[in-house]
Amino acid sequence: MKKSIVSVLLLAITFGFFGKSKAQEKDSLYEARKLKIDEINFVSGYYTQEGEHSSIGGGKGDEALTNISNSIQVRLLKNSQKYEHRLDVAVAVDHHTSASTKLINNVPDGSPTNIYSGKISAKTAASSGTSGVTGASSKFVGWRIYPSINYFAKNLERNTTYGIGAYYSREFDYQSIGGELSFVKASQDNNAEFSVKAMAFFDQRLEILPVELRPVNTGVNNKKADDDEDEHEGNDDNYKLWNKNSYSVNFAYSQIINPRLQVSLLADFAFQDGLLSIPYNRVYFTNNTVSSEKLPMQRMKIPLGMRLNYFLGETFIFRTYYRYFFDDWGIKAHTAQLEIPIKISPFVSLSPFYRYHHQTSNDYFKPYGQHNPGEKYYSSDYDLSSFNSQNIGLNLHYLPLESKIFKSVDFRYSFYKRSEGLSAHNLTFAITFK
């Protein structure tokens, strides 16, 4: 699912490379305009993957997954003599099917006994009528909805922009509320720009354990009230409800060096606390016991990056990107990307792209059956393992210049391959209406 979201962001960056019109000169007799719809963006994506390291199966099992996503964004503009106001309202819906999801309520073939002592109940969330953050029906499993709203006010005299945004996301076992504040300052000649954005997300996740790890004396099986003083709380369905908070500050500085060369420097600082593990991910130990994934309750992440765009005449643009990432869980990663938009005609451009990623393993990752029972933290999620990945694809951008309805149309395809075996295909279609 994350990769389909990344594709949407990449499309947004690609839009307008060859379709930007020259900025109009300011008129001293400028008149304020009423609120109007500036454009409507529709994006639809299809993502499918295959692999054999299911995290729900403890690092072993079918990872086949299909995700279909659709989003629509309406952009409203209103100009006054001093300010330009912009309001973006969007809603997106995803639906995915996963081969390993059924293993939450079913014991994998050949699975050993659980790490808990005592009798184990095989009563499932579906049979107890509990399957959501607030009691949602099991028919919503696989669905995700995430609306957002963003407002920006640009001071035309000072060339500064202030922004505020709100986000919401909901799945059958997870919900998130977030917000952001942003500030952008551009030079008077628009050759340099500095931006900063602060974001915070407050998430809640139900502690839905694999079926064989649900003791009879807790949670859903005996409807026990939550009257303890631990860091989580119960809900009407008697699943434990855990919190996760995420905070980040993003800095960016861009500079036009000359008419052909533009450079951007990027730095992000992120901190998370709360439940950072996924309760229904299994971990198998060397003594033939099994437990759910357990990771530290805090994490700090710092990505540092740079973009360099070089315009070779009116036909080619070389867009390069590099990022170095590290966190306090032991991961260090390098990512490099090259994209070359090629102007075929005034209406059409093609953009082949290639992305390479290398990362070291998380301190708490081990493959299936290799964790020791005495370890404090453990995970067999291969997203936290050491691997190399490659992503290659092509974007087709079409500008119907004479159309009174369509502003741009994009098709984007990519193929993703990881050294540990995971592979994926991603197809995205985007259209912007005037």
Model segments located where?
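Membrane-embedded beta-strand positions of outer-membrane beta-barrel proteins
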Residues: I40-S44, L87-V91, Y162-I164, F194-A198, ...
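Outer-membrane beta-barrel translocator domains and adjoining extracellular loop/strand segments
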Residues: E52-G58, S100-N106, Y174-S182, E207-R214, ...
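Outer membrane beta-barrel transmembrane domains
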Residues: I120-S128, G135, A267-A270, L275-N309, ...
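Residues on the lipid-exposed face of transmembrane beta-strands in outer-membrane beta-barrel proteins
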Residues: I72-L76, P147-A153, L181-K185, F251-Q255, ...
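Repeated loop/turn-to-beta-strand initiation elements of outer-membrane beta-barrel proteins
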Residues: K82-L87, E157-Y162, N190-F194, R260-V263, ...
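Outer-membrane beta-barrel translocator/channel fold
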Residues: S54-I56, G61, A90-P147, E193-R260, ...
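Transmembrane beta-strands of outer-membrane beta-barrel pores
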Residues: S44-E50, V91-T97, W143, A166-F172, ...
